[in-house]
């Protein structure tokens, strides 16, 4: 069975195609992605209207490329992200998916974007057991309890302000490093001293870890602290080491991300920690997560770099799992939801 997935929740237009075997084995046969990142760079962040227009322009070329890679003219099922994400961006992808499904006469599945990030784990390893997923990107920073791919997830914690990726972008802007901030901060941090400056770790005090925000994050404080450090240096005429600032900022972020994720694994008895989202490509996050997982006897699963960022393959993957388990299609009348809850893997009505 050939399952096609469309991703358009933010600034990537992705079409992925999976060959789903009768035993549930999934093989990637098509994967095409177009990004509008360069169009957003001069604004220092994603502009929803620009993202929506870019999806419109890219959808057909990306679709043709993925189908050509797979060597098929039409799939047996079509899936699309219907939430969470940017309203206009979601509408473009979901509308295209439903139009293709209607034209091809195949069922449509409206799936959860976050479930897609979890589903990629089954593409590159054994079936995911009871796990904790740490999803980190420019739009999301969440700790989720996962029983299995395609099943309702439970949110244990999330950011109360900026997402981690958003904090990277804002700090990069403060330092004049451009957009997106994640890759350049990570690169410069590798040459800096991560102990040079002690930036705050949000919601990591003893009282926080005992209370309702045990698994929650806050990155506005570290962002503000970096801004004050830079402003103070400018006032005093001091030359700062951008590499040290990047390394110290990054350490503050990944320290709290990994410590809370490991804590969630221990508290829930989960044997696996899964990293997902664009920030999962960060070298220091991977390094520290690996060290802390090894120390805690927890298995770490990290997708390949290409599958960390938004893509259509992850949407095809979660749909394939649902189809294999006998889930009914969504129907063409299903809408989109910018704040779709993680407990909903497949949408039948909104």
Swiss-Prot record:
Keywords: Acyltransferase, Cytoplasm, Iron, Metal-binding, Transferase, tRNA processing. Its cofactor is Fe(2+). Substrate binds at residues 135-139, 169, 182, 186, 282. GO terms for molecular function: iron ion binding; N(6)-L-threonylcarbamoyladenine synthase activity. One of its GO terms (cellular component) is cytoplasm. SUPFAM superfamilies: Actin-like ATPase domain. Fe cation binds at residues 113, 117, 310. It catalyses: L-threonylcarbamoyladenylate + adenosine(37) in tRNA = N(6)-L-threonylcarbamoyladenosine(37) in tRNA + AMP + H(+). Belongs to the KAE1 / TsaD family. Required for the formation of a threonylcarbamoyl group on adenosine at position 37 (t(6)A37) in tRNAs that read codons beginning with adenine. Is involved in the transfer of the threonylcarbamoyl moiety of threonylcarbamoyl-AMP (TC-AMP) to the N6 group of A37, together with TsaE and TsaB. TsaD likely plays a direct catalytic role in this reaction. HAMAP family: TsaD. This is tRNA N6-adenosine threonylcarbamoyltransferase. It comes from Corynebacterium diphtheriae (strain ATCC 700971 / NCTC 13129 / Biotype gravis). The gene is tsaD.
């Amino acid at each position: 069975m050939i399952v096609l997935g469309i991703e358009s929740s933010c600034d990537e237009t992705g079409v992925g195609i999976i060959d789903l075997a009768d035993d549930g084995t999934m093989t990637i046969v098509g994967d095409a992605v177009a990004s509008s990142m360069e169009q957003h760079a001069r604004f220092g962040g994603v502009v929803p209207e620009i993202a929506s227009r870019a999806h419109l322009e890219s959808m057909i070329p990306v679709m043709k490329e993925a189908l050509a890679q797979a060597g098929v003219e039409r799939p047996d099922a079509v899936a699309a992200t219907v939430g969470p994400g940017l309203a206009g961006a979601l509408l473009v992808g979901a509308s295209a998916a439903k139009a293709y499904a209607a034209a091809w006469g195949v069922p449509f599945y409206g799936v959860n974007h976050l479930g897609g990030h979890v589903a990629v784990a089954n593409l590159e390893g054994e079936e995911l057991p009871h796990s904790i997923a740490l999803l980190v990107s420019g739009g999301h920073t969440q700790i989720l309890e996962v029983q299995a791919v395609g099943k309702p997830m439970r949110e244990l914690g999330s950011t109360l302000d900026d997402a981690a990726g958003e904090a990277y972008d804002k700090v990069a802007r403060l330092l004049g490093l451009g957009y997106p901030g994640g890759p350049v901060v990570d690169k410069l941090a590798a040459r800096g001293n991560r102990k040079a400056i002690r930036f705050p770790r949000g919601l990591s005090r003893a009282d926080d870890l005992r209370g309702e925000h045990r698994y929650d994050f806050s990155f506005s404080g570290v962002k503000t602290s970096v801004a004050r450090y830079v402003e103070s240096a400018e006032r005093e005429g001091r030359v700062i080491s951008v590499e040290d600032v990047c390394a110290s900022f990054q350490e503050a972020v990944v320290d709290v991300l990994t410590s809370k994720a490991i804590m969630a694994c221990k508290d829930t008895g989960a044997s696996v920690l899964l990293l997902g989202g664009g920030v999962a490509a960060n070298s220091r996050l991977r390094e520290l997560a690996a060290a802390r997982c090894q120390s805690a006897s927890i298995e770490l699963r990290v997708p390949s770099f290409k599958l960390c960022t938004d893509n259509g393959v992850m949407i095809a993957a979660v749909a394939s799992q649902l189809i294999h388990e006998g889930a009914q299609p969504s129907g063409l009348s299903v809408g989109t939801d910018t704040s779709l809850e993680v407990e909903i893997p497949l949408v039948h009505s909104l």
